[in-house]
Amino acid sequence: AYEIAQCLVGSEMCIRDRPRGAARAKRRVCVPLAHAEWESMMDRRQLLDRAARNGDERVLLAHILDKCEQSRNRNIPSATDFLSPAEQRSAQDLLHAAAIHDGCAFCGGFERAERRMLLFLPDWQEEADESEYMTALRCTYRKEDTLTHRDFLGSLMAQGVTREKLGDILVSEGSCDLIVSRDIAPYLLQNVTSAGRVKLSVSEIELSDLSVPKLKVKEIRDTVSTLRLDAVAASGFSMSRGKAQELISSGRVQLNYRETLKSDAPVAQGDVISARGLGKFEVAEVGGLSKKGRTALLLHRYL
């Protein structure tokens, strides 16, 4: 890791993942490297061997490196397709392994977006322009009709749209906002006419006009004897610790969107724990110790 970090200190590849609306950085130092210099200093295959856990992840990470190099070599903005939370975690691990800390951003159309693109910035661009790569479509229908996330996703898939071209799907009463790759928006505007048996009226809107549903969470205050995954999962999903251990060992539990088979995996404030069929929750706050030596927790379980 030290060798890779040393070879990338002078490159123009950077990462920026700050909230939208935050102040721009006043200064960036980026020194471009020739392609031959890049190849001589970093072994791409070695980096992928280190970061990828399986063949599918290797393909994903190789694609991300391609986009990164495209931006650097041609000095232009570049972006991946939409990435799931798990894929974003893999991308972050790759960037960390390559010591890339500035010059790119995860963007999904709004602050709490789950599915996001990874945008790489050239040295002349201070801030990511997500609207260059994605747009929003608003589908309206009668309020008396009931449609779900699955209805809209199924309708889009029926049109031959792949999941990586789709961002978040925001369903409200009588309308649904779709965040999509800009290159497929014209096709969807012409071809998406219904979801299920319900007729839709579809129009393009600005990302700033998205109707984002209010986040609904259930607050859980509890204490645990240890900040192990099994203990915290048992608290968040209201089950015994033994049952939580069974879920973990069967591969049904993810810690920060990564499958985790170790019941004793450490959990920290800000971590997200999910289980297939049970939903997910965030460790919103880790408090102090009680008189009995138990750790206080505030959990936000998503509804």
Language-model features, listed with the residues they occupy:
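Basic polycationic patches enriched in arginine
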Residues: 16-20, 24-28
